């Protein structure tokens, strides 16, 4: 009875999907077609954005699922693609007419369970937006952006449009890591700063999505594998064999969708070696979560409330994440700070200063890795009002 009610509720929602696709040769693999076939069951209309080019067969395949096909230069990754779509391709009245918007891309295999079942389960969560996986590291938390669903309040209030318009230049010119900051963390920070609630299909998960896909799948129930897990710098046959064995024995997902991609791209034959169940249990038991920052988000936000003028120490990935996720709480961002006298002039459009050139008693968030933070601590901790993401002993 309850399942029938849930299905009815899900089916009554007017939902559009926005799919971002990239493949260097424009080839549309079978796993992509499977994903689109699954999504067809849950969306009323599908828009497809292609970064780069499509081969003829790829175009024919995508046209089976949508004639709303937008091909653009391959710049800015998926964040740039969505920004381009909202700013240049779609009428704002059309996009705000939907009850829900799903943005997703082709950077993963799966889902290995029914997409309809995922939407039915998440219909029980009274949240404004959700995704597959929420990563909680005390600060700079976020929902991974390869599959995001935005509900009515966000859609009708045109929040996505405003975000992508405001950050269009950064997103369309971003490197991969800048995209992770400006799109993934930035959009999450923007929405949560405005009071929108969020949820995720997988709860309490801090395992590395690239190096521990088996733990994410078997222990946490994450129904996808990121394509990058097959890259040579991340590839572990024993880890992936655990995933593949789980998929074969526990799901209806066709493992050949992954095998065929692997054989085409890497020109290697994928041969599953049976994994001993005790070894799997031990591997899952001993998996180490991603380390968390020592500072709490409450303490970070209190620091921002109590201090108007803020510098962020660093001009790398962590500093970018802090800026994009918490910029809405910063009254006056003075710029980024680095140790080197020879440095870039600007980062995300903001000034970059040598630490020796900023006034004494400046308010600084030290957004560096633990070792680098320890190296700079003695030089700044007695001169400035500082907040470190990690506990540092002086």
Language-model segments: which ranges?
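ER/Golgi luminal nucleotide-sugar-dependent glycosyltransferases, focusing on the catalytic module
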Residues: 2-294
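Hydrophobic, well-ordered beta-alpha structural blocks that scaffold small-molecule cofactor pockets
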Residues: 283-394
């Amino acid at each position: 009875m309850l399942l029938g009610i849930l299905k009815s509720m899900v089916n009554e929602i007017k939902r559009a999907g926005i799919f971002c696709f990239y493949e260097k040769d424009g080839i549309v693999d079978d796993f992509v077609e499977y994903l689109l076939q699954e999504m067809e069951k849950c969306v009323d209309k599908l828009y497809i954005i292609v970064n780069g080019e499509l081969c003829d067969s790829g175009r024919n395949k995508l046209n089976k699922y949508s004639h709303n096909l937008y091909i653009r230069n391959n710049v800015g990754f998926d964040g740039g693609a969505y920004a381009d779509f909202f700013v240049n391709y779609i009428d704002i009245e059309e996009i705000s007419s939907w009850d829900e918007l799903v943005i997703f891309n082709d950077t993963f295999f799966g889902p290995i369970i029914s997409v309809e079942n995922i939407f039915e389960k998440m219909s029980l969560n009274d949240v404004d937006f959700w995704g597959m996986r929420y990563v909680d590291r005390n600060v700079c938390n976020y929902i991974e952006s390869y599959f995001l669903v935005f509900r009515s309040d966000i859609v009708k209030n045109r929040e996505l449009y405003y975000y992508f318009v405001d950050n269009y230049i950064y997103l369309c010119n971003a490197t991969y890591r800048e995209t992770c900051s400006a799109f993934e963390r930035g959009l999450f920070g923007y929405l949560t700063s405005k009071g929108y609630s969020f949820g995720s299909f997988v709860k309490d998960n801090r395992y590395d999505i690239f190096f521990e896909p088996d733990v994410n799948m078997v222990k946490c129930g994450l129904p996808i594998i990121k394509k990058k897990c097959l890259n040579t710098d991340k590839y572990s046959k024993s880890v992936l064999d655990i995933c593949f064995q789980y998929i074969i024995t526990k799901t209806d997902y066709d493992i050949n969708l992954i095998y065929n991609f692997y054989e085409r791209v890497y020109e290697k034959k994928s041969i599953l070696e049976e994994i001993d169940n005790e070894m799997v249990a031990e591997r899952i038991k001993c998996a180490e979560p991603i380390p968390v920052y020592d500072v709490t988000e409450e303490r970070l936000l209190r620091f921002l409330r109590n201090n108007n003028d803020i510098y962020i120490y660093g001009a790398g990935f962590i500093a970018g994440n802090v800026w994009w996720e918490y910029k809405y709480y910063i009254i006056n961002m003075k710029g980024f700070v680095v140790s080197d006298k020879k440095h870039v002039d600007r980062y995300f459009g903001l000034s970059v200063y040598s630490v020796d050139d900023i006034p004494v008693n400046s308010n600084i968030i030290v957004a560096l890795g633990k070792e680098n933070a320890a190296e700079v601590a003695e030089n700044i901790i007695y001169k400035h009002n500082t907040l470190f993401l990690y506990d540092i002993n002086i």
